[in-house]
Amino acid sequence: MAVEPQTGRLSAGRAQLLAIAFALVSGMSAVIASALASHALGHYSPTAQASWDVAARMHLAHSLLMLLMSLCWAQHAYRLLGVSCLLLGLGVILFSVNIYARVLFGDSFVSRLTALGGLCLMAGWLVPLPILSDLWRRHGTGALRS
């Protein structure tokens, strides 16, 4: 984080801006994936369509979480928020994109990484937890009540 000399406001660094941009593009691509599911995958099996739907829902939900984490990271210099963004982005790629590829192209070695993507998504939720402890220590119990 840097302080802008003219305004005295904190400005986000390149990594934070990149995380925000990635989250926005990821969210847009999740919407595209959902549109494809309802308009272009009619000839695929119900199992394939259900897999695609799960991937698209997970993609969108975690893109929103990644956007939230990246916006918080741009405001507060907690490195764990950046780690969370990285894990969520990697998780979306390894989980959702692998499922999309498996539906379109069939099973491959790369699709075996889907479980690793799921673990990255789970870790993306948990990594910021120590920030709560830090906030608790700094501000006492009142910080979490208000």
For each feature predicted by the language model, list its residue ranges.
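Interfacial segments of alpha-helical transmembrane regions
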Residues: 11-25, 80-88
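Hydrophobic cores of alpha-helical transmembrane segments in multi-pass inner/ER membrane proteins
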Residues: 61-69, 121-131
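Interfacial loop at the N-terminal end of multi-pass membrane proteins
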Residues: 4-13, 36-57
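Core segments of alpha-helical transmembrane spans in multipass integral membrane proteins
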Residues: 25-36, 50-75, 79, 88-93
